[in-house]
Curated annotation (Swiss-Prot):
It comes from Streptococcus thermophilus (strain ATCC BAA-250 / LMG 18311). Specifically methylates the pseudouridine at position 1915 (m3Psi1915) in 23S rRNA. One of its GO terms (cellular component) is cytoplasm. Its EC number is 2.1.1.177. One of its GO terms (molecular function) is rRNA (pseudouridine-N3-)-methyltransferase activity. It is found in: Cytoplasm. PANTHER family: METHYLTRANSFERASE, RIBOSOMAL RNA LARGE SUBUNIT METHYLTRANSFERASE H. This is Ribosomal RNA large subunit methyltransferase H. It is an enzyme of class 2 (transferase). The keyword Transferase applies. Keywords: Cytoplasm, Methyltransferase, rRNA processing, S-adenosyl-L-methionine, Transferase. It catalyses: pseudouridine(1915) in 23S rRNA + S-adenosyl-L-methionine = N(3)-methylpseudouridine(1915) in 23S rRNA + S-adenosyl-L-homocysteine + H(+). Pfam families: SPOUT_MTase.
Length: 159
C-alpha cells in the first residue's frame, strides 16, 4: 500500500516540516508515503467570484493530474464527514480490503477545493468546523494517518 498526500502551497515553517518528516519516517514501517506539494495560484485582494473560480479550477487541474485512476481519494473539506480516530483507521483498512493499493489525501489551497476535485474524491473528510492553517493541517493529518496505522496494529500509542 502507498499513501500519497497532495497539498496546494509551499510548506514554509521549519517546525512543521520537522514534525511532518518525523511522522513520515514513522510511517515507513507500515507503508510507502509520498508527499506532493503543488504551486498555489496567487489570489488577488478583493478577487471576484469569477477569479476565485478560475483559481480553484487551475489548482484543481493540477491536483487531479497527480491522482491515479485507481487511487482511493480522501479530500479534506469542511463539509466532509468527521471520524473518530478508530473509525478513520477502519476506513483506511476498508479501502485496502476493497482493492485500493494507493490512498491519496488532498488538502486544497486557501480557497479550498474545486468541485471537480470534490467529485473525484471517494470520501470528503472534515476535522470539524474550526478553521486551521493549511500548513498546520498537513501535520495534523499526517499524525492521524500514523495514529490510524498504530490503531490497526493494536499499539498503545492511541491511548
Amino acid at each position: 500500500m502507498k499513501v500519497k498526500l497532495i497539498t496546494v502551497g509551499k510548506l514554509k515553517e521549519k517546525y512543521l516540516k520537522d514534525g511532518i518528516a518525523e511522522y513520515i519516517k514513522r510511517l515507513g514501517r507500515f507503508t510507502k508515503f509520498e508527499s506532493i506539494e503543488l504551486t498555489d495560484e496567487k489570489t488577488p485582494d478583493n478577487a471576484s467570484e469569477a477569479e476565485n473560480k478560475a483559481i480553484l479550477d487551475k489548482e484543481g487541474q493540477r491536483i487531479l493530474a497527480k491522482v491515479g485512476d485507481r487511487d482511493y481519494v480522501i479530500a479534506l473539506a469542511i463539509e466532509g464527514k468527521q471520524f473518530p480516530s478508530e473509525q478513520f483507521a477502519k476506513e483506511l483498512e476498508q479501502a485496502t480490503l476493497r482493492g485500493y493499493s494507493d490512498i491519496t489525501f488532498i488538502i486544497g489551497g486557501s480557497l479550498g477545493l474545486s468541485p471537480k476535485v470534490k467529485k473525484r474524491a471517494n470520501q470528503l473528510m472534515s476535522f470539524g468546523l474550526l478553521t486551521f492553517p493549511h500548513q498546520l493541517m498537513r501535520l495534523i493529518l499526517v499524525e492521524q494517518i500514523y495514529r490510524a496505522f498504530m490503531i490497526q496494529q493494536g499499539s498503545p500509542y492511541h491511548k
